[in-house]
């Protein structure tokens, strides 16, 4: 069995000009794309988005806070903990927020069931009737994050000097050579030159900051196996 190792950071909102056959990217698109990954320009919204865990009385409770654009958020409140860490896939509630103001976000239930929450850099304070709990932000990481290629692995992309040698040349709709890399990262649509049958694949992704693109236009990342879903 082959071990295939690859580390990707996909910039999914990229355009290029048809005048050039070189691997260049339009300057306006380049600036816009870099901003999607610049934590400093994103600011506090990025710090507030994420997963929160705590207790409501003696029961575990968790929330996933998602930025929605225009400094607004929604929070998915999960009974028992986070997905894969206590939540059974059943009970949950959704809270919607007013815009972020002075580092503080206030949430209310759209069903007027009395649930509310306040979010700031200290955490998410959740109140439901007489019950109240403080949830703290956590960052979960895969056990294989940053895994180094084992001996004999086929490294498709990554390392200190990533290149596209393992991938086919791409053509745009006019038949001209299209960019395959941007700022050291692979663009979407790359296809390996080699074909594999029995393998273990390690891949890592980074996606851009697009809170306003709800629900299906946000950046995502994935791989087609066998050139299909």
Located regions from the model:
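Bacterial N-terminal signal peptides
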Residues: 6-15
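Generic detector of short alpha-helix boundary/capping microenvironments
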Residues: 10, 38-41, 147-148, 191
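Carbohydrate-interacting regions of secretory-pathway proteins
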Residues: 27-28, 82-229
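Boundary at the C-terminal end of the N-terminal hydrophobic targeting segment
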Residues: 20-24
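Positively charged n-region of N-terminal signal peptides that target proteins for export
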Residues: 1-4
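Central antiparallel beta-sheet cores of small beta-barrel/beta-sandwich binding domains
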Residues: 26-119
């Amino acid at each position: 069995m082959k071990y295939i190792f690859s580390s990707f950071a996909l910039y999914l909102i990229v355009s290029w000009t048809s005048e050039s056959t070189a691997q260049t990217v339009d300057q306006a698109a380049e600036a816009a794309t870099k901003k999607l990954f610049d934590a400093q320009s994103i600011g506090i919204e990025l710090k507030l988005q994420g997963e929160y865990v705590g207790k409501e009385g003696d029961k575990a409770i968790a929330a996933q806070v998602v930025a929605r654009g225009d400094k607004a958020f929604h929070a998915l409140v999960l009974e028992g903990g986070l997905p894969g860490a206590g939540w059974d896939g059943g009970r949950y509630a959704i809270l919607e927020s007013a815009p972020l103001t002075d580092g503080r976000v206030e949430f209310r239930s759209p069903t007027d069931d009395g649930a509310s929450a306040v979010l700031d850099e200290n955490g998410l304070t959740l109140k439901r009737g007489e019950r109240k709990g403080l949830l703290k932000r956590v960052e979960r990481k895969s056990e294989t994050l940053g895994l180094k290629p084992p001996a004999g692995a086929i490294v498709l992309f990554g390392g200190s000097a990533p290149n596209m040698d393992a991938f086919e040349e791409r053509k745009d709709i006019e038949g001209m050579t299209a960019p395959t890399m941007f700022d050291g990262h692979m663009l979407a649509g790359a296809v390996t030159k080699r074909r594999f049958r029995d393998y273990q694949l390690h891949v890592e992704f980074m996606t851009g900051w697009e809170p306003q693109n709800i629900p299906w236009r946000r950046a995502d990342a994935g791989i087609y196996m066998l050139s299909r879903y």
